[in-house]
Every structure is written in structure tokens, then in C-alpha cells.
Amino acid sequence: MKKQTLLLLRGAILLLLCSAAGYALYQHVAGGRNEQAGTVLQQQALNFRLSTLEGGDIELKKLRGKAVLVNFWGTFCTPCKEEMPVMQKAYDRFKGDGFEIIAVNVRESKGAVKRFVERHGLTFPVALDQSAEVYRSWEIYYLPTSIFINREGRPERMYVGGMSERQVDMWIEDLLSGS
């Protein structure tokens, strides 16, 4: 009887520890964020030049004077797939207001990215970081990651994970208003 009680107690403690570790991981990766959250950044954005899905090039520094949302994503990434309609709505809404989106796909073939873009009706610029050079130099660790860059070329916010339409619109409006 004592052995059974001890075994049950050990099992309960193990379950409690696993639950606490799981909750801590969830809070770190996906939870604990409110609509206002996001890492605030100060330094100048690192320039990059990447090929686009259409065959041209896009260079970040040439967009100076515009508010820019750089979104690192992948076709395999569920939160990335879920936020693409949000990105398209934001692009449609703000593109005439001195705003641009660069969706930087990381390490996927041009064909896979093109199929994804066509299937989802995306019209904003899609850049291909097939070697993940920009991804690494910007010290991005998770997909999706979005960086909001002001008109002077300084990143103001970085958000890791999928974003709501409300968040995207609010942060773009902040960039455009200069606040």
C-alpha cells in the first residue's frame, strides 16, 4: 500500500512539473501577448537585396521614405498561412499611403512559393531568401516574424508569431503617423 501511494505521489509531482514546463513554454512562444505588445527596436535596419518572385530585385534601402513591414514566413508554417489574408488586407488598405510590405520567404523553392502566392491571391512583393542569409543576418529565429520599419529606415517593432488584423492595422497606422 505504501509503495502504491509513493508511486502515485511521484506520478502527480511529475505531472505537475510537466504541466508547469508546458505552460512556461506556451507563454514564451505563443502566449502572454496583448494587442499592444511587440519588441520595440531602435537601430537602423540592415539593408538587403533579394530576388522577387516576379524575377526582379527588391532592396530595402530603396524604400526609404515609406513605412515598411518586412514579414519573414514559410509556406509550411501554419501561423504564416493564417496571417497572409491579414497581410493582403493591410496591403490593399495602406499601399497608397506610403506603405509597403515585403514578404521574405525563407529557404523554399520558387515554384512552391509561386503556387502558394497564386492560391492565396497575394499581390504584395514576395522576396526569396533561399539561402536564409537575410534571415540569419537579421537574427530571426521563428516564423512568422514581422518587423515594422519607419520612413527613416529604423525598425520600430518586431513581432514573433501570427498577428491579428487589429495589430497589423494599429502598428501600420502608428508608422504612418510617425508616432
Kindly give the residue locations of the regions a language model identified:
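N-terminal targeting signals for export/organelle localization
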Residues: 1-47, 171, 179
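A short beta-strand-turn-helix
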Residues: 47-68, 91
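Conserved hydrophobic/aromatic "anchor" residues
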Residues: 48, 58, 72-76, 116, ...
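Conserved redox-active cysteine motifs that mediate thiol-disulfide chemistry
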Residues: 64, 72-89
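Active-site acidic short loop of glycosyltransferases
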Residues: 64-66, 96, 122-123, 140
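Hydrophobic beta-strand anchors of alpha/beta hydrolase catalytic cores
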Residues: 69-70, 101
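Structural microenvironment flanking redox-active thiols in thiol-disulfide oxidoreductases
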Residues: 81-120, 130-137
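Thiol/disulfide oxidoreductase modules built on the thioredoxin-like
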Residues: 115-123, 128-179
